Amino acid sequence: MQEENIRESIEVDVLIIGAGPAGLATAIKLKTEANKNNQEINIVVLEKGSEIGAHILSGAVIDPIGLDMLLPNWKELDPPDMSEVIDDRFYILGPAGSLRIPNFFFPRLMSNHNCFATSLSNVVKWLGNIAQSLGIEVYPGFPASEIIYQEDRVVGVITGDFGISKEGEKKDSFMQGMEIRAKYTVFAEGARGHLTKTVIEKFKLDKESDFQKYGIGLKELWEVPEENHKPGLVQHTMGWPLDNKTGGGSFMYHFGKNLVSVGFVVHLNYKNPSLSPFEEFQRYKTHPIIKDMLSGGKRLSYGARVIREGGYQSVPKLTFPG
């Protein structure tokens, strides 16, 4: 109780947990609308990563309609390098061969033409700079650890303590987390945020939704020889190396200066206990149509993250008290 009495506390109008594309877009939209109406609004965005974009792994194909609505002049705001999609391919893979599915078989919503291939991490960093230029306070390195409730309403969060040893002891550099109270709190933590889960459970936001389903996505960023690079190529596959009882697929996006984002997704309802998504990803890269594009290149970075796959019917109610 004594620690709670000395805990630093600040109050804001809107608190957003997570400085990903959703969290930053929310902050920018709120701020620009407030500015249009000559209203003052204090917005704080907390990000657990050490810097904006640190936890964003996906190579991305971005439909510019979202940017057009959020920032109509976005092309004049020095956006990150983007390659317009000019070649959109889908293959079914076998152990040695492949079958390309003609584009006319796919519904319009699956077409990537007029979209842009880019690094989502760089897009998020760019959005972060725009948010800060608008006067939005963005705090990287500040994870939200606990939700504050008052009369069954969310009124803010408590940030994590700093200066804790691996044994759980307070070090000389210990700094207690602070309370950030807000009129409105937005949780934009990603696919399986730990605070989001507690909010969903407390307010039973998923009682009318189907069960959520998840996959694991593994991604690498490669720099390839210029002769292997096809700017604007977006390629997706399904099939090998996964068997017909295991769901998943792959993506490959060519963008920037000889950069290729390659990823592999495995649905987490697979039955084979010996299956390793990592090993399947490595096997996938030995397929001729993948190997030929990566040959002579070097891997620059890699990572993995959970992906929501339940679809629209699994989306919980998105509003709650607070």
Listing of model-derived features with the role each one plays in the protein:
Residues T246, N272-G322:
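FAD/FMN-dependent oxidoreductases across multiple families
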Residues V12-V44:
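N-terminal Rossmann-like FAD-binding beta1-loop-alpha1 element of flavoenzymes
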Residues E40, K48-G97:
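N-terminal FAD cofactor-binding segment of flavoenzymes
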Residues M1-I17, P21, G135-F142:
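Glycine/serine-rich loop-strand microenvironments at binding/catalytic pocket rims
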Residues L99-L120, N129, G156, V265-V266:
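Helix-loop-beta segment of a Rossmann-like dinucleotide-binding subdomain
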Residues V14, N42-S50, A182-V186:
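Extended hydrophobic secondary-structure segments that form protein cores and membrane-embedded regions
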Residues A22, E51, R192:
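Conserved Rossmann-like nucleotide-cofactor binding loop
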Residues Q39, S121, W126, I130-I290:
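Predominantly flavin-linked oxidoreductase catalytic cores and closely associated redox partners
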